Amino acid sequence: MSPRHFSVRGFNAVVPASDSAWQAEIPAHLKRRDPRIWHMAYVAAARLLKNAAEPPRSMAVGTALGALDETKNFLDGIFKDGFGSPKNFIASVHNSMAGKLALEFKIDGPNLTLCDGQNSFASAVASCTLFPSSAFTCLVVAVDESIPLVNELIPHLPPVCAAHLSDSGQEAAVALLLDRRVIPELPSIRAIGPIALAGKEPSALAKELAARLHNGAASSISPIEKCRSFVSAPLQIYERLTSKQTGILIIPSYSPSSKACAAVEVSL
C-alpha cells in the first residue's frame, strides 16, 4: 500500500541559532516552570496555530532525545544528593512534552510521541495514518535541543557513537498542521518507514524507500548524509515549504540506534 498523503495546512518553526527573539513569545506561566525544549515546541506550535480556525484534534511529536537538560538535571541530583528531583524526572520523560502541548492547545484526541533518532520526524508523520478521519487536523511537532554536555561527552564515547552525535548541536522545533484530505492547492507530505536495514547499507535502503515514494515521478532526493542531525529532516521540509519551490523533495534518514531508514516526501 502506498503511504498516505496529508495536506499541509500550515507550518512554522523555532530555530534558536537564527531567531534570537523567540523566547519573548513564551507565556509567563510556562517560562517559570517548564524546560527549554518545551518552550521551543510551544512557540513553534503557537506561531502555527495563531490564526487557526479551531484547535487540532490530535497530535504527534517526534523527538530523538527529548528534554536533555532535564535528564541531566535529574541525574545530577542522583549523583550529588542521592536522589533526583521528581520535577526533573517528569519533564525528562519524552511524551510529557506532548501532554503539556495538548493541555495548552486543548487537543483532546489521539496523542503520540515517536522517538527513533534521525527517523523521529518521519515516524511522527507516518503515525498519522493510524488516526481516524475524526482526529484531523493533526498537529505534528519535531523537536530536539542541544546542551553543552553532549559535546563534552563525545570525545569519551566509542567512535561509532561519537560519529553519529557529532552533528547533534543543531536544534530546532518544527510544527506542521496536517489534514487527512488531499487539498490540491496545498502542499502535501507523506512518510515511509522506519524499515530495518536487514543487512543492507543505509544508502542503498534509502534509495529503495525513495523509489517507493516517487514511483517514477520526477523528484529531487536529498543525500542521506545531509540528514545526520536529529532535526535535519524537519528543517529541510520547513525550508522547502518556506521557499515555495515547486516539485517533489524526498528526504531519507538513517537512525543508527534502531539500524533503520525512513523517508519523508513533500510535494508543492
Q: Which ranges hold each PLM region?
A:
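Short-chain dehydrogenase/reductase
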Residues: 125
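Conserved "HGTGT" condensation-loop signature of ketosynthase/thiolase-family condensing enzymes
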Residues: 1-122, 130-136, 142-268
